[in-house]
From Swiss-Prot, chains A, B, C, D, E, F, G:
Organism annotation: Dictyostelium discoideum
Similarity comment: family membership: Belongs to the PA28 family.
Protein name (record): Proteasome activator 28
Lineage, highest ranks first: Eukaryota, Amoebozoa, Evosea, Eumycetozoa, Dictyostelia
Keyword Nucleus among record annotations: yes
Main subcellular localisation: nucleus
């Protein structure tokens, strides 16, 4: 501190405007974007589940998921081609994951800017804010790491294809490749349900505690700027 | 919070409908799906155990599990073929694991959406909800990682077969391959018992505490939406 | 919870029958299987110890354990053969380990199903149940990882044999192989004592606390179904 | 301590001047630099988001982000060229990250030098200082590690290009390269929002608690030199 | 628990006999085996120390430990031979380590079987039992991992000899080999002292607290069976 | 303790003299060395910052930092030459880091020797001593690991140059090398500020608490020897 | 415990004699060995520091430490020769480290054997004993791991020399080798100071608390045997 007097630093108008902008986006997300997303993914989870069942009972022509046996009998030129269905589904899910991260990072941004001055008590509301920021940050980290899913899928596929080409007589490499592709379909079958579930659980946490997020210390509102 | 007034955000009807849908599925799972699964896996554990005993006493013709010695004497072309029994049993267990994950993630979803607003006390019911969500999440993680079992089995088998082909005179690689296959049979012999046991233990935890899961704070039901 | 009334979910008869079946097996294990195992392994530990001593004093013809020097002088064709005694002993111990895991996982299963509803106090009995479940789970994990022992033994042996064949003049690889085999014999010499000791210690813990395992909350038995 | 008398050591004038210099820079950053940065990155986040949307609807000629398919069809000489847009955007972000680190390390330096003598109580203000130093240090560590982003991007790109050149028929390597580049664009799309958000959250924390940072122990100012 | 009555399970006579057998061995170890071992290793530590000093002053003809320089000048055929002294000393120490493990695992076994029923208080004696079991387990783990010492010594020696043969002009590999052998001699010089010290410290802990190990809960002896 | 009487052991005069010598060096460092260093590095940070700005605006002839593009166009013989400026700056910083470690390890040595006898209370002063020893030890560890910086820089540079020579057509390796060199200049730009900041923060901590470091327990000075 | 009576086990006379022997060595170390070592290393630190300064100002003929440039210009046959000064200094330090470990492990041994029976209170003295045993164990671990220093130095040197021979045109490998050697000289320059400092700090801790180490529970000496 300067030797003679202490300096008064106030929240800059531009920053308050930035916070207000995040607040409006937050309200829009809670009233419109998120409920719509939950309904959308609930439907997609149902229809995706239905498709897999039809496929297992042979009702659909276009088989997305091959059986392990197919991988052993398939000529090598087909084997090393990338499965179009897997690639397209990856792109769809990446868009969905980016949307989720963008939506909740706005809400996290607003809550962080709404944390009042550190005080030696009366912190229940601040604990709620910090608890919810932690939950949202965890959610964003899960979906950020899921974004790397396709890179690691292609890397494993490429290295197995390399081994298949090098050791044409070792059947187990082909089965291993079958498992790598099958795992993607298994993950897809959970992904829509998980998206609906994660949106809903985090939405429910925020909505039920919105009053505390807005006014962490009810008595003296002034300290929140 | 907007400078002048605070916004009221209510749980969206679509989300409440989503929660109701999860609730009905949860009740169905507790009354029908899970008890049926426990009985099914209890039987499979008994019959699987019986088969292994008959096989050891040479009563069954079709030997699923070869002895180590077989692996040393077997011609290389047979050695490098994948064991059909192991592959089929993998596929059966993967289906069972996916079913378990789907069943309990629905229940976890409902419980999460039933967690009331964060309050500074009267949280015994919420602690029960969070404790059971943690147990279910752990169960789902165990079975999600078990889904990778077949990929790592084929990868180890392939790399050992490669070494056997390259070092035909090193007996120990063949014994190592025998252990890799034998370990799968040992795992299968535990898997049905573990499935019955895990379904039953988690079911017992949920059923005995269902009242608290439904109504974590008895006095004022309104705060659960 | 459904908006109008709360649902009563009771423990399904099939699950209670499953629990009863585990209970009867538990009593049988405590009264018959385990005491018999402890005596059996106590004897095997003594006789195994006796054999090693006779062998060191050269009394027995068939030397199971070779000295390091033998490994340096031995022709390479013999060196790369797997030691029959080690393989047979592995198979014996694997059977013993599987039996131990099966025996205690049944007891663990029964105790888990006997954990009463979560309550905010009067939990001393439940703590005893959870403490003993933790001890049994640790024991099962130790013996499950010991099951992998033979696979890693053969993998180390194979890779050393490969180096010996490649670098015939490097004596130290042959000594290293001698150590790998010798370590198996050292482990065997402890294994029977450890089996007796682990069975006895876990048995003693369960038997001394059996009343609490059966009736964790003495006053009101109804809550255990 | 010297056997006879204790030595009085006072804060050197040069060090007090150094602290005063950091203090003035801190005030300038809080009043000018940081609010300007928040507004700047808020704008960049909006305009960057807008560009990506236009690009996806094909409105802009210069496509920064290629689709996976482009990577499979592209001739190898183009494939192995580094994407100019990615490189330029890296350089821009590195400048922004260095600025952020320089800005907040000055503020951290001032706060550290303003921590008073260790006392056995009356430490609420010191806890606020230490808490904020921890937050700033975390922020600096995040952006220091982000500085390594471009080195690891080029290393992954180089090693994938090497594999593509070596295994021209393995399509999956090309898709893997597409993911590596696409990931950079996804990171860029978050980076401006994160910069605005991190500046604002840390700024809000410092400004709201500036009084405590300046005068951690209100009663006796003398102990802060 | 069976729906109608609770079962009484008592400690099986065979198990009590097993415990009694461990008890007698424990008393013998404390009165005879261990004091003798401490004296023996105290002597060996002194005489080993004396030999090293004589060797450094050149008094002994047979130099066990070569200087680094010897390794550079030595012809390659001698260099790649394993140092007889190191091998023989390894075998001696392995015998000593196995003895230590066998001795204390018997004592640990007895103490474990003497742990009374879990009670909600009056546990000071039980804490002493568990503390001493932890100390003995740590000691067994240290000496079990030391048993692997010779395997890793030969593995490092073999891989360095391989490099020396491949890069005859790189002096530093020969110095590295000198360090690997020298390190064994340094370890040997500590090993006898450590054996005496570990035996004595653990013995002192057990003897001083023997009353508590025998009778953890003085008042009612019946609960220990 | 010897069976009959207890031995009195006093601090040896040579050790007290050693402590006095450390004390005098400590006072000299706090009054002279450190303030001078803080001022010196504050200046160097400013001038280093100024140079980089001039360079970016092209005012200086001798460009220390090349742009990524230079690395792609540069002939390979120049590319594989080590950047003189980076090497010289490394040597300068290593000297500065060694000085910092020597300066503060003397102060840490004195404080450690001034820790009084362990007592069951009245330990506030001792806690201050131990807290400051921990801070200084952390500082020394940071700068000891920074000393390894140049070894790892040359190792990364060498391995990238090797790849560039092997894969002349893979541009990304050249960009990767550009990043490795650029990272050193970025680190240099922070290093002088960090040196000033770390000296100042640790100095301020020691000076403000010097009375407690000298006399941790005011009442009875005798126990500090 | 045997079913009828409890056994009295007393500390064996040989063990008490062993403890007395450690006690006498401890007193000798505290009165003679350690103070002498502190003075010796204090001197060596000063003279080593003096030599480095003279060398930097070119006063001494025999340059122990070469500059990085020397490594680039030096013919390869000289480069691959091991630096005699580094090797001799390693041997000197190894002797010093072994002495330190032997000295303090004797003291640790005595303290451990002087720990009284575990009691439910009155444990301040025992806490002091355990705290000091922990400090001495940490010191022994630091110097045991430093003993491996020369092995890892020669391993790094050998692998860099291999790379220099393989890639004669990559200058950076020669600079990397210069850093590896320079790091040893930097470590040497700290080692004597650290030896003096570690001896002194541990000595000061033991001497100031010697009364508690000897008589942890003043009231009743009998329980210490």
């Amino acid at each position: 501190m300067s030797k003679n007097n202490s300096t008064v630093i106030k929240m800059d108008e531009q920053v308050l405007k930035y916070k207000e902008d995040l607040y409006e986006k937050t309200v829009h997300h809670l009233k419109v974007t998120i409920p719509k997303k939950i309904a959308e993914y609930q439907e997609l989870a149902k229809s995706y589940g239905q498709n897999s069942e039809n496929e297992q009972d042979g009702q659909t022509s276009k088989k997305r998921k091959l059986d392990s046996e197919d991988y052993v009998l398939m000529p090598i030129e087909d084997l090393i081609k990338t499965n179009r269905v897997i690639m397209e589904t990856h792109q769809k899910f990446k868009k969905a994951y980016i949307e989720l991260i963008e939506t909740f990072s706005v809400i996290r941004g607003w809550i962080s800017l709404n944390i009042p001055r550190i005080e030696d008590g009366n912190n229940f509301g601040v604990d709620v804010q910090e608890d919810i920021i932690t939950q949202i940050t965890k959610l964003e980290e899960v979906y950020t790491s899921l974004l790397d899913g396709s890179e690691s899928y292609f890397a494993s596929r490429a290295s197995l294809v390399k081994k298949i080409l090098k050791h044409k007589d070792i059947e187990a490499y082909r089965y291993s490749l079958a498992q790598v592709d099958e795992k993607e379909f298994t993950r897809f079958s959970f992904s829509y349900f998980d998206l609906a579930n994660n949106y809903a659980t985090t939405y429910s946490l925020i909505v039920k505690n919105f009053a505390k997020l807005e006014t962490p210390r009810p008595t003296n509102a002034s300290n929140i700027y």
